[in-house]
Each structure stands twice: as C-alpha cells, then as structure tokens.
C-alpha cells in the first residue's frame, strides 16, 4: 500500500493525501499547484 501525501506536498488527487483533501494553492511564483490540505 502507498503512503499518504502530507500537508503542503504536491498531490494528484484528494485520495492521495493523509487529510483526504487536495486543493489548488498559489506557490511563490503565483502559479496554482494542487497540494494536500
């Protein structure tokens, strides 16, 4: 089984995250990147 992705790490979809939530957030460059909540 794969380990879950932690908060603020890039994620492909909600199910990948330990929190079960992956949303778009702005990075330092102002780009929208999906990261775990």
Curated annotation (Swiss-Prot):
- State the source organism's domain of life: Eukaryota
- In which tissues or organs does this protein occur? Expressed by the venom gland.
Protein location: Secreted
Q: Which InterPro entries match?
A: Omega-atracotox
Marked site (Critical for insecticidal activity) residue numbers = 10, 27, 35
Record-level GO BP terms: defense response
Q: List the disulfide bonds.
A: 4-18, 11-22, 17-36
Q: What is its main location?
A: secreted
What's one GO-annotated cellular component? extracellular region
Name the UniProt key words of this record, in alphabetical order.
Answer: Calcium channel impairing toxin, Disulfide bond, Ion channel impairing toxin, Knottin, Neurotoxin, Secreted, Toxin, Voltage-gated calcium channel impairing toxin
User: What GO molecular functions are on record for this protein?
Assistant: calcium channel inhibitor activity; toxin activity
Q: What does this protein do?
A: Inhibits insect, but not mammalian, voltage-gated calcium channels (Cav).
- Domain remark from Swiss-Prot or TrEMBL: The presence of a 'disulfide through disulfide knot' structurally defines this protein as a knottin.
Q: What family does this chain come from, according to its entry?
A: Belongs to the neurotoxin 08 (Shiva) family. 01 (omega toxin) subfamily.
Name of this protein: Omega-hexatoxin-Hi1c
Provide the species name: Hadronyche infensa
Lineage, opening ranks: Eukaryota, Metazoa, Ecdysozoa, Arthropoda, Chelicerata
């Amino acid at each position: 089984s794969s380990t879950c992705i932690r908060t603020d790490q890039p994620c492909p979809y909600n199910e990948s995250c330990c929190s079960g939530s992956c949303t778009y957030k702005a990075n330092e460059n102002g780009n929208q990147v999906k990261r775990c909540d």
